[in-house]
A protein has these predicted regions:
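Short, glycine-/polar-rich solvent-exposed loops and beta-turns at beta-strand/coil boundaries
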Residues: 1, 29-33
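Short acidic, glycine/proline-rich loop/turn micro-motifs
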Residues: 1-2, 49-50, 90-95, 139-143, ...
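Short acidic/polar hinge/loop motifs at secondary-structure boundaries
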Residues: 1-21
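Extracytoplasmic
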Residues: 12-14, 32-36, 47-49, 63, ...
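Non-catalytic regulatory/gating segments with a bias toward low-complexity or hydrophobic composition
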Residues: 17-18, 37-39
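Short beta-turn/strand-loop junction motif enriched in small, turn-promoting residues
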Residues: 22-25, 258-260
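Periplasmic-side early beta-strands and strand-to-turn transitions of outer-membrane beta-barrels
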Residues: 25-26, 38, 45-47, 53-55, ...
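Face-selective signature of the C-terminal outer-membrane beta-barrel domain
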Residues: 117-135, 150-261
Length: 261
């Protein structure tokens, strides 16, 4: 519960990565006490655009990706797909290692990302995003078995962003991530299935002096596995308040967050 399969996110689907350094727990939860890494996938631009790429390298590594994105009136869209495979190399080269296996340890992955947004009025928009990736990865854990892990990552999100008054905006976001992982070794098979559902309602208000953000967040985490973990579920309700004031070269920020798990 609470883990993420970063290895299942393909590089060709990433638009940019932003690193926020310093305490960020008030906005992102207790795990962000030292900062956060935000990964943004591709979205539609202001005009129609298509992209495609292929590659080939050592260990019979091949990669390909293609996509289209653009804007049509009030609708912005993006569709990206790609894949990558490699024969790999022997992960453990020392025959004296008890996990040594003379085979190559390769991988195969395929992914698709789709997103769309609709501006139904000025400063009023609806949006949705879907992502899926399948990763089949070989590794060495025993001498006589084709050890491998298959991970399927599914994620979707819907959102509504609205300006209520010139000084007041809100956003409502709901999403779910499903992470299914199955490892096969000589010693047995291990299944992990996680479901992470999140809801967030945030208000951003411009005050006569500074800005105020208020938010309510709920996170529901579920784990199904065959390893016998003691804790397989967690629900967290969070209340968040952030006040920001900038005056010339001086800046003040006050953060308050309460989590109830």
């Amino acid at each position: 519960v609470g883990a993420a399969s970063f290895e299942a996110i393909p590089l060709d689907q990433i638009e940019r990565i932003e690193i926020l350094r310093g305490p960020a727990s008030s906005l992102y939860g207790a795990d962000a006490i030292g900062g956060v890494i935000q990964i943004f996938t591709r979205r539609g631009g202001s005009s129609l655009a298509a992209n495609a790429s292929v590659g080939y390298g050592t260990y019979a590594t091949a990669t390909g990706a293609a996509g289209v994105s653009g804007t049509s009136g009030p609708v912005r869209y993006s569709l990206q797909a790609g894949g990558r495979r490699s024969d790999g190399f022997n992960a453990i080269a020392n025959p004296a290692n008890f996990s040594w296996n003379p085979d190559r340890d390769g991988y195969e992955t395929a992914n698709v990302t789709a997103s769309a947004s609709y501006d139904w009025a000025k400063d009023q928009s609806l949006g949705a995003t879907y992502f899926r990736n399948r990763l089949d990865n070989q590794f060495d854990a025993s001498a006589g078995h084709d050890d491998r892990t298959i991970t399927v990552l599914d994620a979707w999100q819907v959102e509504s962003r609205n300006r209520i008054t010139p000084a007041w905006r809100w956003s409502i976001v709901a999403g779910r991530t499903a992470d299914d992982s199955k490892s096969s070794t000589e010693y047995g098979e291990y299944d992990y299935r996680t479901r992470d559902t999140q809801y967030r309602w945030q208000h951003d208000i411009v005050l006569p002096a500074g800005d105020l953000s208020l938010a309510y967040e709920r996170r529901e985490e579920r784990l199904t596995e065959n390893a016998g973990f003691a804790v397989t579920s967690r629900d967290t309700d969070s209340a968040i308040a952030v006040y920001r004031l900038v005056s010339g070269p001086q800046a003040l920020q006050v953060n308050v967050r309460h989590d109830d798990s």
